[in-house]
């Protein structure tokens, strides 16, 4: 697994330098996304009815429901016993698990729609496996954004779900119309209406109907609806997910 990551140009142990190289490789996609925002047509979105039926969307993975799961750059495990008082407190899924929860949601969706046998018997077991894989392959809480690279590579290399960074709002609409769930990173401040929240949060875009996007977040048990043009303007980067 580590060798596979290295062969893609991503070092097993990610650093800020690795992150800079990754950003440079996708900067053109980010630029084209921003340019496409100038072509937003509200009337177009109001007439769209595309995407995955709510009937097929799994219950969202709410990271708040996994407070007993440790997940940071050192390890990932179920915390049934006291771990003492480390110099740097351990983080839990509840406070830092937005990306693994989004990845788990995508994985469960494809298992359901393709009617495949479950490899993981519980949601907690799946989330623990994803989180452990992230930690072992370079996720580092000290380095902002390294989890973006991990998401990009691990969904495909480990779970067989290729991802493609969306280069424009039209790319994304096409992906949604093709019933490919899209993971998007948005400002936590916008998502929760609190300007004091400075991080990013992963959401999943499932459908676009009547000018609204149907999304799931990793901090709620239910689906939500947001104005699609506002959503597009707040997306930092997005990945369409599909099964080959």
Model regions and ranges:
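Active-site-adjacent structural segments surrounding the nucleophilic cysteine of cysteine proteases
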Residues: 4-142
């Amino acid at each position: 697994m580590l060798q596979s990551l290295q062969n893609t140009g991503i070092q097993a142990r990610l650093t800020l330098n690795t992150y800079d190289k990754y950003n440079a490789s996708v900067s053109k996609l980010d630029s084209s996304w921003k340019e496409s925002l100038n072509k937003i047509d509200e009337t177009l979105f109001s007439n769209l009815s595309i995407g995955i039926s709510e009937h097929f969307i799994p219950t969202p993975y709410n990271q708040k429901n996994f407070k007993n799961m440790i997940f940071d750059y050192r390890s990932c495990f179920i915390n049934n016993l006291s771990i003492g008082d480390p110099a740097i407190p351990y983080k839990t899924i509840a406070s830092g698990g937005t990306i693994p929860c989004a990845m788990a949601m995508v994985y469960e969706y494809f298992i359901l729609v393709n009617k495949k046998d479950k490899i993981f018997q519980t949601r907690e077991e799946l989330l623990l496996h994803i989180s452990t894989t992230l930690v072992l392959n370079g996720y580092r809480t000290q380095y902002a954004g390294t989890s973006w690279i991990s998401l990009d590579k691990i969904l495909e290399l480990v779970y067989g779900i290729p991802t493609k960074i969306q280069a424009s709002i039209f790319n994304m609409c096409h992906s949604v119309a093709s019933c490919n769930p899209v993971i998007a990173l948005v400002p936590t401040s916008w998502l929760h209406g609190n300007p004091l929240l400075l991080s990013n949060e992963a959401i999943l875009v499932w459908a676009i109907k009547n000018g609204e996007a149907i999304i799931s977040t990793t901090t709620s048990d239910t689906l939500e609806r947001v104005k699609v043009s506002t959503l597009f303007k707040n997306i930092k980067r997005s990945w369409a997910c599909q099964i080959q």
